[in-house]
Amino acid sequence: MVKRFGRFCAAGLWACLVLATGAALWTTCAYAADGELADRVVVHKSEHKLYLYSGEHLMGVYRVALGLSPVGQKERERDFRTPEGHYFLARRNTRSDYFLAIQVSYPNKQDEVRAHKKGWAPGGSIMIHGFPNSPHHPSAYYESNDWTDGCIALSNSDMVEVWMRTQDNIPIDIYP
């Protein structure tokens, strides 16, 4: 009897999670169904904000977390800085260690030249992503601190919206 009740509760919890996630994705899909997709992403590191634009129309503003050393240009692998410059959204990853991930085309040619002049590897795998799938801290930590290795992180709900409102190969400009 207890085993059956436990399985019933687990199945019920799973169903609730699926329905809640499905409802959130459906709402976002309905939101994006108006046909308006962003054609440009802008990040202002000093503001901890990501902006989505369609032409000159501001579509959304999202709070972001950055690398553990958020001030300054990324110069090399493992410096925990978020890059600054002109890049593109390169590809999407649903199997990331984080809730959804969109790769940023860092390093660009200037980044590579700058790093190699100093004898460093420029690093890579800069992503826009949600919170970790296996978190080590409460959500409040990820919401209020810079915690990434250099990536741009959003809450999971904001990540769904950014995912649905963008396409690959659109520009992303990251400013100090």
What does each of the following model-derived ranges do?
Residues 31-39, 46, 66-91, 109-114, ...:
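N-terminal post-signal-peptidase region of extra-cytosolic proteins
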Residues 11-24:
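Bacterial N-terminal signal peptides
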Residues 57-69:
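Short Gly/aromatic-enriched secondary-structure transition segments
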Residues 36-37, 91-176:
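Exported/periplasmic cell-wall-interacting domains
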Residues 40, 61-63, 86, 125, ...:
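Well-ordered beta-strand positions in beta-sheet-rich domains
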Residues 1-7:
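N-terminal secretory signal peptides that target proteins for export/translocation
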